[in-house]
């Protein structure tokens, strides 16, 4: 819970397409806070689309880049902020960060079917691809299986995050409101 005049950082964790960026932007706008997206920081720092970053760097290297961006946002950007955190595979990469008194870490969760409905497809330059809905529906069983596996894996990694926000198919606006009521006011 936010108290007094201290600067606070809300860190939103979750699997891909759960809504970290969308909810984060809405939450920051609602609160009048700054918003940072680690994925955007990766694109700027590494000079490549996210797909290339994932395919070029090792898991440990990706975690190191993400961690350094989070620390940069925490230490160099004064004031209250919301940070959307891209998936981190090792607890040791973030456990000291979420233990900070000025950090509210929240794990966004949703049902696989709801996450599937939010899936989008981009090309090698991170541009939205047209006609992806038909492709998505053709491969629905595969993507639902992948989402379930991601949830199972990241539940084990993110089990140290003290706050869980179950999206349960709500709109991003409703989730931002839920976070505000539960952890900010």
Question: Predicted regions span which residues?
Answer:
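A glycine- and Lys/Arg-enriched "phosphate-lid" helix/loop adjacent to the NTP-binding pocket
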Residues: 101-153
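Conserved substrate/cofactor phosphate-moiety recognition/catalytic segment
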Residues: 29-71
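P-loop (Walker A) phosphate-binding loop of NTP-binding proteins
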Residues: 15
């Amino acid at each position: 819970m936010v108290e007094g005049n201290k600067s606070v950082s809300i860190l939103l964790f979750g699997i891909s397409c759960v809504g970290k960026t969308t909810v984060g932007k809405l939450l920051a706008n609602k609160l009048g806070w700054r918003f940072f997206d680690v994925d955007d920081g990766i694109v700027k720092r590494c000079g490549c689309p996210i797909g290339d970053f994932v395919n070029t760097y090792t898991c440990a290297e990706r975690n190191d880049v993400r961690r350094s961006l989070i620390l940069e946002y925490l230490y160099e950007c004064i004031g209250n902020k919301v940070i959307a955190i891209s998936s981190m595979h090792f607890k040791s990469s973030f456990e000291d960060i979420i233990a900070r008194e000025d950090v509210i870490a929240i794990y966004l969760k949703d049902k696989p079917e709801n996450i599937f409905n939010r899936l989008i497809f981009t090309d090698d330059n991170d541009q939205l691809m047209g006609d992806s809905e038909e492709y998505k529906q053709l491969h629905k069983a595969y993507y639902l299986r992948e989402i379930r596996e991601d949830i199972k894996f990241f539940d084990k990694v993110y089990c140290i995050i003290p706050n869980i926000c179950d999206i349960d198919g709500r709109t991003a606006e409703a989730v931002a409101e839920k976070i505000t009521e539960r952890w900010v006011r």
